[in-house]
Amino acid sequence: MKHLQIIILALLVPILANSQQTIEGSITHDGLERSYILYVPEKYTPGTAVPLILNFHGYTSNNLEQMFYGDFRPIADTAGFIVVHPMGTIDQLGNPHWNVGWGASTVNDVGFTAALIDSLSATYTIDAERIYSTGMSNGGFFSYRLACDLSDRIAAIASVTGTMNINQTATCNPSHPMPVMEIHGTADETVAYDGNFFFASTPTVVAWWADRNECDTPPTITAMEDTDSADGCTAEHHVYINGNSGSSVEHYKIIGGQHTWPGSAFGGVGTNQDIDASKEIWRFFSKYDIHGLINPTSISASPLSAHLNVYPNPANNFVIIDWPFVDVGEFSLHATLGTEVLKGNLVSGKNEIDCSALSPGIYFFSAGYAKQFTAVVVIQGNN
């Protein structure tokens, strides 16, 4: 991400102007001074516990670049969580890194992470049950290491273009079912989607976590709408549900995607713009604490097999949908050839959908964050 450096220099002024929210800090661990950049949203209120996201940079990158590249700050402003961007140490090749078992690194980054959580928790009101880890590339690898080696502190992880080392699963024994999201491009030339001699393939890693959490298989696979044909890639959403403690495993397969963070403002060809990785990661994290699913009655937490009442069916002028969630949902109705003919929002309770303008025929109804609710609706026409 060296190409980001010049651009980021131009963005430093807003950071300094907003210094009450963006804080540079450091702690000493194992005799090393370890730095970080902390983002605290304006809505943070001392005494009210908030989630913490650990956002780890990639190999050769740094925490400032990651703060802009895999940006969670606008989401934190509305959701209210704190996000910290730790800085790795310099390896024998002179590059910033996280110790995931590569080369001859002996840095105790797992211990540093635990100490950083302790330090931040002593200053800010952190919800100890809602601490999450994410990262780009080497930072994604490290998030998997934390899922294995610091699971008593980490509620869920998400990796972007990272994976796990070969045979790492043999010693990985999390203390609780670990919700995992993996976002990875099939054209990634840095961390190959199909793996190599040193690290496991993305499908292998995703399947291992789904099996460990005892999720339902096979996954539900949804092709995401190609909203930006100029990005040179498309996205599939693979969702494994109903794991222990309500855990799930999600994988965004970026077909034609490169070694990039989807939705990043610093994009280009091979950077998928059909999804926003940061938004999807928070949507995923927000469902879980360290004990598992927080609120099974929310839309995004509902299992894909859940039942939704859509009636009468066949219908004439109106279809009624019973929406059992507090969250506002989105629905769409498609004709048999795939054309979207109707869409809108669903509020808690009964929703009366006007179908009077539709021609008689068969339509496909879907609703929910991953289109987890589906139904075939027959429209008979006006009576």
Language-model features, listed with the residues they occupy:
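The feature captures the conserved acid-bearing segment of alpha/beta-hydrolase catalytic domains
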Residues: 155-245
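Serine-hydrolase catalytic machinery in alpha/beta-hydrolase-like enzymes
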Residues: 23, 27-132, 145, 149, ...
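A domain-start/cap signature at the N-terminus of enzymes
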Residues: 18-52, 78, 130, 134-158, ...
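The conserved beta1-alpha1 loop
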Residues: 54-58, 161, 184-185, 255
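Bacterial Sec-dependent N-terminal signal peptides
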Residues: 1-21, 296-299, 339
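Acidic beta-to-alpha connecting loop that harbors the catalytic carboxylate
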Residues: 88, 186-189, 256-258
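Extracellular low-complexity, Gly/Ser/Thr-rich intrinsically disordered linkers
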Residues: 248-289
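C-terminal outer-membrane/trafficking sorting elements
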Residues: 300-383
